[in-house]
């Protein structure tokens, strides 16, 4: 795992984590313990896997997620937004996440120490919620039913933009930025999802979900305010190549 530091005009050091996918986390916590950021921002995809069929909660099938969140919260205030892999989590799962002390930002915002932190929820999550409400099941099976919701819910961002303070938006999907966020008054957008392009040739990623071949938004700083993490693990059938997992620190 690599540590990457970007210097931007943030009021305090922010750690950006993304795409844990329920993997071991000791080296991540060691880095956070050494660096001591003021806040820890997790831009989605902490969970991995399909809902259980035995009546248990999805979060109960995750070996590392809750201990990881507790360990983060013991080091610094921790904020979490929802990525595409959180699509199946139900209300009970989300409550277990909140019980760790983590602040869940689900198309919502909060304030902390002069900062305004928001979380833009993945449209995959919204579509599964629609299915859940329709079928009145904790973990509905999509089956052959087509996906209906294909865009994030952005109406609440108008209020978020008006808040006084340094505005940080956790947004799992970097591809949302050009269409939904570029023209908004937001100081910092923190993303993941692209896994650095999975294989990298020099600075170019080869493939990213939602962007396809030779994606543009896989890591680094874009437009002076979009920061993308290459992610903390790999659950894809294709291994990473020239693309180590990454924890990002944004500091002044």
Predicted regions and their residues:
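Acidic, histidine-bearing metal-coordination/catalytic regions of metal-dependent phosphoesterases
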Residues: 1-15, 20-21
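Short acidic-hydrophobic surface loop/beta-edge motif
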Residues: 4-9, 107-113, 218-223
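Acidic/histidine-rich helix-loop elements
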Residues: 14-26, 46-61, 88, 125-143, ...
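Active-site neighborhood of phospho(di)ester-bond hydrolases with catalytic His/Asp-centered motifs
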Residues: 16-18, 39-45, 77-84, 105-107, ...
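Core catalytic region of metal-dependent phosphoesterases/phosphodiesterases
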Residues: 25-113
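Solvent-exposed loop/turn segments at secondary-structure junctions
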Residues: 46-49, 84-88, 110, 123-125, ...
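Conserved beta-sheet core of the metallophosphoesterase superfamily
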Residues: 79, 174-249
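Binuclear metal-dependent hydrolase catalytic cores centered on His/Asp/Glu-rich metal-binding motifs
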Residues: 100, 113-171, 177-179, 237-241, ...
């Amino acid at each position: 795992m690599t540590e990457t530091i970007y210097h931007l005009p943030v009021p305090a050091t922010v750690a950006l984590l993304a795409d844990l996918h329920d993997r071991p986390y000791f080296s991540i916590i060691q880095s956070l313990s050494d660096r001591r950021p003021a806040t820890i921002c997790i831009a989605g995809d902490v969970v991995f896997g399909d809902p259980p069929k035995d009546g248990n909660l999805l979060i109960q099938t995750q070996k590392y997620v809750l201990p990881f969140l507790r360990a983060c919260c013991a080091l610094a205030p921790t904020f979490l937004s929802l990525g595409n892999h959180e699509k199946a989590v139900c209300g009970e799962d989300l409550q277990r996440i909140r019980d760790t002390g983590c602040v869940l930002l689900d198309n919502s915002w909060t304030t902390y120490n002069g900062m305004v932190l928001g979380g833009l929820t993945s449209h995959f999550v919204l579509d599964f919620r629609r299915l859940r409400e329709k079928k009145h099941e904790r973990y509905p099976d999509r089956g052959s039913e087509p996906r209906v919701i294909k865009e994030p819910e952005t109406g609440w961002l108008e209020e978020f933009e008006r808040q006084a303070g340094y505005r940080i938006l956790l947004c799992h999907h970097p591809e949302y930025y050009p269409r939904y966020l570029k023209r908004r008054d937001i100081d910092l957008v923190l993303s993941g999802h692209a896994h650095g392009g999975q294989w990298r040739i020099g600075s170019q990623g080869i493939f990213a979900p939602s962007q396809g071949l030779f994606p543009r938004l896989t890591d680094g700083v874009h437009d002076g305010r979009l920061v993308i993490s290459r992610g903390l693990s790999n659950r894809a059938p294709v291994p990473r190549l020239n693309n180590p997992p990454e924890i990002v620190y944004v500091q002044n």
